[in-house]
From Swiss-Prot:
Source species: Nitratidesulfovibrio vulgaris (strain ATCC 29579 / DSM 644 / CCUG 34227 / NCIMB 8303 / VKM B-1760 / Hildenborough)
Protein name per the record: Formamidase
Gene: amiF
Enzyme Commission number(s) from the entry: 3.5.1.49
Domain CN hydrolase, residue spans: 14-260
Chain coiled-coil ranges: none
Pfam families: CN_hydrolase
Record CDD domains: aliphatic_amidase
Function recorded in the entry: Is an aliphatic amidase with a restricted substrate specificity, as it only hydrolyzes formamide.
Amino acid sequence: MGSIGSMNKPSEGMLMGLVQYPVPIVNSRRDIEASVDRICAATAATKAGYPGMDLIVWPEYSTQGLNTKKWVTEEFLMDVEEPLFQRYAQTCKENDVWGVFSIMERNPNKNQMPYNTAVIFNNKGELALKYRKLNPWVPIEPWMPGDLGQPVCDGPGGSKLSLCICHDGMFPEQAREAAYKGCNVYIRISGYSTQVNEQWILTNRSNAWHNLMYTAAVNLAGYDGVFYYFGEGQVCNFDGTTLVQGHRNPWEIVTAEVFPKMADQARTDWGLENNIFNVGTRGYVAHPGGVKDCPYTWVKDFAAGKYHLPWEDKIKIKDGSIYGYPTTGGRFGL
């Protein structure tokens, strides 16, 4: 962190802003349009207030809300290419800023459930990255697991960006996948309620430390009549320490300077605790070059399609019936 309150753009890094968007109460298509209006206006205002801002991040569900009675209906779903969502791209272009945005996306396969998707538009309004949530928050979320893997793209200030959505961040395997593909700034957008606030903070830090990369995470904020959403935008250094963390205030904008080249340097220069390298080169002092074989049963089983826990047959909740979802799969909720 190189400036008071992270108000200035660093010459060899990037200035980012995490917006603790008030959880939108969405009951109609017009409400979605109004949310897009607010996000576009706030993106422009934030860039005007922070002229050096490189990247602005909006939480999961900020576009379409969390109306579980309607969230999988055609009225509520969107496509990245449609004019309403493309307003975000135009806003990024007009304001010379990168942006991360949330969309509940129609599935091209009409026989399957929609995707929970996040995109990065660059400062020219171009689609830099599209990511579909790999690990929906079962059993409450009905989204189809993502089919795009864990993409990484070049970002501002020497960054290599990758996205995860909410529950994804609870999986260290996924953060490692992003880092293994070169990510040095791992962005997490979420719509969690307060029940997992501490675990969210913990995993943001651990994902950073395990992979020697920055993590930046932001959650919805406020009350929607059912749950309270905790906000608390957080940016973690590549050593797992928290650089900055917000409070529970809706509309709080958490800003941070990050220096991706420092994470890159740690990855190339460290010996002790360079664990993303050491895991694949075990014991290189005793065995030159390190032992390369995989010692982990679960990794081998997962790769072979045989992942099975010792207690798996005793697990009580394995479908969405507790939340009223059918157990037959396919497309439902139209």
